[in-house]
Regions:
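Phosphate-backbone recognition surface of nucleic-acid-processing proteins
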Residues: 4, 9-108, 165
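Low-complexity, acidic/Ser/Thr- and charged residue-rich accessory regions of DNA metabolism proteins
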Residues: 41, 45, 78-166
Length: 166
């Protein structure tokens, strides 16, 4: 599954997933779509475009390497899924199964690096599906940020207002 170290940079890098109307929009945003050279009737696809957020693309590519392992719902994943809707859990399980199968199929024919990139592209589609499934009421409120400066403690709330605490 996608843990905090993968999810947090994605949410921070992409921002509001509602502005992306299709999973391909997220794939384009991350630069995970194949380049294309067309002329007349010929169409040749090349490597990924790499246009877009390189940090998020790297994070997803690293996460894609985990799909070479057999899918399972471990205790850690069960704990993370508590409180999630049944539909989100179903999407996550289908993603694990499909991406593992895709990685195995592609790595048998191509280099494993190319397989990981292709799986990262497909993983972006599943991330988009889950992000669209979570409604704003389901999304947790932004946490308070506590800062200290010269012995004083300040609290920054969700509205970005700073207040000194006692």
């Amino acid at each position: 599954g996608v843990q905090v170290l993968t999810g947090l940079p994605l949410v921070g890098g992409v921002g509001d997933f509602d502005r992306l109307t299709h999973p391909r929009s997220l794939m384009h945003f991350l630069g995970l779509t194949p380049s294309e050279h067309s002329s007349g009737g010929s169409r040749v696809q090349g490597g990924i475009t790499r246009c877009g957020n390189s940090h998020c693309r790297r994070i997803l590519t690293e996460a894609a390497w985990h799909y070479r392992l057999q899918p399972k719902v471990s205790e850690a994943i069960q704990q993370r899924q508590q409180g999630q809707s049944k539909k989100v859990q179903t999407i996550a399980w289908e993603a694990q199964q499909r991406l593992h199968k895709r990685f195995k199929t592609l790595s048998a024919k191509k280099k494993s690096v190319i397989a990981a990139t292709a799986v990262a592209r497909e993983l972006a589609g599943f991330v988009w599906a889950i992000a669209c499934e979570i409604k704003p009421a389901d999304k947790p409120a932004a946490p308070e940020i506590i800062r200290t400066c010269k012995g004083k403690v300040y609290r920054l709330d969700a509205n970005k207002k700073m207040a000194q605490t006692k």
